């Protein structure tokens, strides 16, 4: 957390040459990511998750954490020449945030195909690599596995036509108010 206000550190007439640093005296490292967050929540609700995700060569502790919830990691792929996706988020005292995001291994998520298993009752396509989200939507539809399309922060990656197709293929759509407005404008 930055103990001040970003607005007091950024000179509006100088943003074209922005070069600013924020001292953040506290740091927390947490596990996150859509697949992990969904699996964690599902486990705490008594459900069983089958996680399909990509991690980097630094992801073994996350695999162990997912397994500790009772979730399957059968479809978690480790990309040895990448780091796991990660975000550095700085929050000021007004809860404004600046985020730097490195997709890392997530950029290879499309190399894992949706498993054709009869025991999958519902899938969720949440923010992931762009190509993976498109391919997995089609693969789920082809396998007749019902799914939720939750584009979240990945929504800006897609054209209006791509979004319409994924919405058409999906059984459910999950967006917040802002994402809903953006989806409406893009389509």
Model-derived regions, located:
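Conserved alpha-helical elements of sugar-nucleotide-dependent glycosyltransferases
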Residues: 34, 58, 132
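Short, compositionally biased leader-like segments
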Residues: 57, 63-64
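Short beta-strand/turn micro-motifs composed of small residues
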Residues: 53-55
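Ribokinase/PfkB-type carbohydrate-kinase core domain
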Residues: 1-5, 50, 64-78, 86, ...
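Detector for Asparagine
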Residues: 19, 37, 57, 95-96, ...
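Glycine-rich phosphate/adenosyl-contacting loop at the front of the ribokinase-like
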Residues: 1-50, 61
